[in-house]
């Protein structure tokens, strides 16, 4: 399959959105010196003022102890989707998420649980790149699959975390995380109805046809 050098408006939008989602994901990861450099580089690729401001605050504010205080056991803001479910069994949720990740050959770069907000947001970034690559290869059907899967994943998974996490972090006193959570909630919207469950894409259904290139989760 061939690709074209000039990006269309849609492709440029997807590239921008992928960078924004990747930055969101990283801002929910545990800070380190390398992490600070990485989020600075990513911030140069995005225009979102909330994300840029969060990165600026993180350079001064973020540290491992503060991260674990906010997100660790007993902290004010749980970052795993399972925390916000009242009835879904943990094993079912994990298998559902893993089925999604396997279907698109997504391998998280972090060791966090599959339902951690940093992993779920990284998956959206990855799907944006999948859609972009498919468009570059003129594979509209594959691009549509990636786009539809991203939208369903937002509605059925990240929507369970985004709003309640945002509300909890506003009172945490941790400015960079509060701003990051606002940016996430703005993209995701309110929690979806629990009655609108959707069928999981199974492992053998989709991934083999994405032949133009495999998006890397860097």
What name fits each language-model region?
Residues 1-218:
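Surface/interface-facing alpha-helical segments and adjacent flexible terminal/loop regions used
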């Amino acid at each position: 399959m061939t690709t074209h050098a000039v990006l269309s408006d849609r492709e440029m939008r997807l590239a921008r959105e992928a960078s924004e989602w990747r930055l969101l994901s990283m801002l929910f990861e545990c800070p380190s010196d390398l992490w600070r450099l990485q989020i600075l580089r990513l911030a140069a690729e995005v225009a979102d003022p909330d994300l840029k401001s969060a990165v600026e605050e993180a350079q001064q504010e973020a540290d491992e102890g503060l991260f674990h205080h906010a997100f660790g056991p007993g902290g004010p803001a749980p970052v795993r989707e399972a925390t916000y479910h009242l009835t879904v069994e943990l094993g079912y949720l994990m298998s559902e998420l893993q089925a999604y990740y396997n279907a698109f050959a997504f391998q998280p770069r972090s060791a966090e649980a599959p339902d951690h907000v940093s992993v779920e947001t990284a998956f959206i970034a990855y799907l944006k790149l999948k859609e972009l690559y498919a468009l570059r290869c003129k594979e509209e059907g594959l691009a549509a699959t990636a786009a539809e899967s991203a939208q369903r994943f937002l509605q059925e998974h990240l929507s369970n975390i985004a709003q309640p996490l945002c509300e909890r972090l506003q009172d945490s006193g941790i400015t960079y995380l509060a701003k990051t959570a606002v940016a996430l909630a703005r993209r995701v919207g309110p929690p979806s109805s629990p009655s609108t469950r959707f069928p999981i894409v199974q492992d053998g259904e989709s991934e083999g046809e994405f032949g133009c290139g495999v998006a890397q989760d860097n």
